[in-house]
Curated annotation (Swiss-Prot):
Region (Tail): 440-709
The protein's name: Keratin, type I cytoskeletal 9
Positions of the UniProt region annotated as Coil 2: 301-439
Lineage, highest ranks first: Eukaryota, Metazoa, Chordata, Craniata, Vertebrata
Keywords for the protein's UniProt record, in alphabetical order: Coiled coil, Intermediate filament, Keratin, Phosphoprotein
Region (Head): 1-130
GO cellular component: intermediate filament
Native organism: Mus musculus
Function: May serve an important special function either in the mature palmar and plantar skin tissue or in the morphogenetic program of the formation of these tissues. Plays a role in keratin filament assembly. Plays an essential role in the correct development of sperm.
GO biological process: intermediate filament organization; skin development; spermatogenesis
PROSITE patterns: IF_ROD_2
Biased composition, class Gly residues, residue ranges: 17-28, 449-468, 501-717
Length: 743
């Protein structure tokens, strides 16, 4: 998600949540080396330590917007990077100069030079870069771009029309056959297939019924055969009984024959005896004997015969009756068993039909169950897929909503930042107008100094070195060296060093440091001398001398003997007898005899009272000091702020103000520290310090022991008599350049 685009704004070209820039920008190769930045919103890389300070798109509203304000489109760090003319990178040209190698020393320099091709210099050169000209240039270029877009769209439409005409004329023709006359035949065949299918099913059902009937008859036949075998066994048993009876009958007949033969023999013998007895008694002999009458044997035998015949007939009748009764019973049993068997067979056939129907119904239910289970599984899979798609859409929409919310928050925060910057710029412009109206006479006495990739005018005793400042003599301090730095003489302190900073002599404190530091060397802080207070360097803190406060580290503020201010991203501690103020993202601790105060992202405090600014709060000096700033102020300045000194001093300045013991002004982007008892100091991007007066220059600033002011980009030195106007000059030049950069 990119918070800003490079098509229609003054910010640098963007990348994904990081710094912008690159070799494609119109600012040239040196600009491309300064404007690369990381995703986290940090400074972009480059040859000239452009990642320090607020370089390379580090200041973006959403934490990583590509090449935001004070970032990649202006070059690298707050020192050397701005000497390459990288400000000219906006939209491939634009106005060069300001913050990019075009601005000269003091109020006399014009904007122009290096890679930007801005407007020429002269007196009042700061005001010649009119924003209306820039807007007209941008509007004209936008109009040309829109005309080109319209022309390309018209040509694209014409080409599409030509392509469609070509395809309509030469495109392949597709011939479709008319197959409607086959539809009736296909329908008839489908009907026949359906009829044959129905018939086939009916035939299969009949075959199944016939098979079942055949099975029933087979079972019935088996049962009849078993019954027949049982009846045959009974008949065989009865035949044995009949044979026994026949044998008994034959035995009785034989016995009867034997008895008849015996009877005949007895009858014959009796007759013979009777004849013999009658033959012997031919004479009449009457003998009367009184005897019992004799038994008639014939009658007895006849009686016996009749009796036996009756017995035989009776036995025969009994046997016949018993046989008939038994046969009747057996026939009745056979009839009953046949009926029962028939009824049982019917029941069995019915049960078999029922079982078959139940089996068919069971198979149907099983088939239906399997089909329903399959349909249920398909439905589950389909709805699971739909649910997964819906969940993915929900997650995508939630991610988009989160991105929209984050972008809305970024835009809201950016809007609030731009609104506050707009308000502050309007106030600063009004202040600059008042200052310029009062200091118009100082422009006429400005000297000439040369800065790499640009030209301008400066004041007295300023000589330009390569890419930056010059060197000064004793009792006035100087600046110079490569890319902005230099060394100063004794009794006045110097400013410079690589990319902005330098070291001063005794009795005057030190100022400068790489990329905008207050005092000390690069990426650290040094300590100031006695009775003058020191200012902190970039990315680290510095410590003040005896009877003076300490100043915090990175991005920020300086301190003096009247009260110390904490820098951003680290915080500092105040010195004795004056109290200290906490820096942003860390807070600070106050010294003895002074209170502590916490602001948003760090607040500051003093021994007498103060007011908190937005995003960090600031601290006011004791006995009447005024302070207040936005975006981190310790007293005054935004993004780091400094603290005001004792006995009435005021401090201010953008992005890191300075402090003084008697009244000083903070510079932008690092600020400087003022001297003792009256001097004012403060420069943009690293202001200078003085022990008795003087003002720090922009981009590194200089210092003087009794007067003098630091020039831009490392700046020159001023004489004692020019201290006040030089201070105004530096402040005005600094703030006007800051105004151009923010715009």
């Amino acid at each position: 998600m990119s918070c800003r685009q490079s098509s229609s704004s003054f910010w640098s070209s963007s990348s994904s949540c990081g710094g912008g820039g690159g070799r494609g920008g119109s600012g040239g190769s040196m600009r491309s080396s300064f404007s690369r930045s990381s995703r986290a919103g940090g400074g972009g890389g480059g040859r000239f330590n452009s990642s320090s300070g607020f370089s390379g798109g580090g200041f973006s509203a959403c934490g990583g917007g590509g090449g935001g304000s004070f970032g990649s489109s202006y070059g690298g760090g707050y020192g050397g990077g701005f000497s390459t003319g990288s400000y000219s990178g906006m939209f491939g040209g634009g106005s060069g100069g300001g913050f990019g190698g075009g601005s000269g020393g003091g109020f006399g320099g014009g904007s122009g030079g290096g890679f930007g091709g801005g407007s020429g210099g002269g007196e009042g050169g700061i005001l010649n870069t009119n924003e209306k000209i820039v807007m007209q240039n941008l509007n004209s270029r936008l109009a040309s771009y829109m005309e080109k877009v319209l022309e390309l769209e018209e040509s694209n439409t014409a080409m599409e029309k030509q392509i469609q005409d070509w395809y309509s004329k030469r495109g392949p023709k597709v011939f479709q056959k008319d197959n409607t006359h086959y539809y009736d035949t296909i329908e008839d065949l489908k009907d026949r297939i359906v009829d044959l299918t129905v018939r086939n099913n009916k035939t299969l059902v009949d075959i199944d019924n016939t098979r079942m009937t055949m099975d029933d008859f087979r079972v019935k036949l088996e049962m009849e055969q078993s019954l027949r075998q049982g009846v045959e066994g009974d008949i065989n048993g009865l035949k044995k009984v009949l044979d026994d009876l026949v044998m008994a009958k034959s035995d009785l007949e034989i016995l009867l024959d034997s008895l008849e033969d015996e009877k005949n023999a007895l009858t014959k013998n009796h007759k013979e005896e009777m004849s013999q007895l009658t033959g012997q008694n031919d004479g009449d002999v009457n003998v009367e004997i009184n005897v019992a009458p004799s038994t008639d044997l014939t009658r007895v035998l006849n009686d016996m015969r009749e009796e036996y015949e009756q017995l035989i007939s009776k036995n025969r009748q009994d046997i016949e009756q018993h046989y008939e009764s038994k046969m009747t019973q057996i026939e009745q049993q056979m009839t009953n068993s046949g009926q029962e068997m028939e009824s049982n067979m019917k029941q069995v056939s019915q049960l078999q039909h029922t079982i078959q129907e139940l089996n068919v119904e069971l198979q149907t239910q099983l088939t239906t169950k399997s089909a329903l289970e399959k349909a249920l599984e398909d439905t589950k899979n389909r709805y699971c897929g739909q649910l997964q798609q819906i969940q993915e859409q929900i997650s995508e929409l939630e991610a988009q909503l989160a991105e929209i919310r984050a972008e809305t928050e970024c835009q809201s925060q950016e809007y609030s930042i731009l609104l506050s910057i707009k308000t502050r710029l309007e106030k600063e412009i009004e202040t600059y107008r008042e200052l310029l109206e009062g200091g118009q006479q100082d422009f006429e006495s400005s000297g000439a100094g040369q800065i790499g990739f640009g030209s301008g005018k400066g004041r007295q005793r300023g000589s330009g070195g390569s890419y930056g400042g010059g060197s000064g003599g004793s009792y006035g301090g100087g600046s110079g060296g490569s890319y902005g730095g230099g060394s100063g003489g004794s009794y006045g302190g110097g400013s410079g060093g690589s990319y902005g900073g330098g070291s001063g002599g005794s009795h005057g404190g030190k100022s400068g440091g790489s990329h905008g530091g207050g005092s000390g060397g690069s990426y650290g802080g040094e300590s100031g001398g006695s009775h003058g207070g020191g200012s902190g360097g970039s990315y680290g803190g510095g410590s003040g001398g005896s009877h003076g406060g300490k100043s915090g580290g990175g991005y920020g503020g300086g301190s003096s003997s009247g009260g110390g201010s904490g820098g951003s991203y680290g915080g500092g501690s105040g010195g004795s007898h004056g109290g200290g103020s906490g820096g942003s993202y860390g807070g600070g601790s106050g010294g003895s005899h002074g209170g502590k105060s916490g602001g948003g992202y760090g607040g500051g405090s003093s021994s007498g009272g103060g007011s908190g600014g937005s995003y960090g709060g600031g601290s006011g000096g004791s006995h009447g000091g005024k302070s207040g700033g936005s975006y981190g102020g310790g007293s005054g300045g935004s993004y780091g702020g400094g603290s005001g000194g004792s006995h009435g001093g005021k401090s201010g300045g953008g992005y890191g103000g300075g402090s003084s013991s008697g009244g000083g002004s903070g510079g932008s982007y690092g600020g400087g520290s003022g001297g003792s008892h009256g001097g004012k100091s403060g420069g943009s991007y690293g202001g200078g310090s003085s022990s008795g007066g003087g003002s720090g220059g922009s981009y590194g600033g200089g210092s003087g022991s009794g007067g003098g002011s630091g020039g831009s980009y490392g700046g020159g030195n001023r004489r004692p008599s020019q201290s006040q106007s030089s201070s105004k000059s530096a402040d005005c030049d600094d703030d006007s350049q800051e105004h151009k950069m923010r715009y």
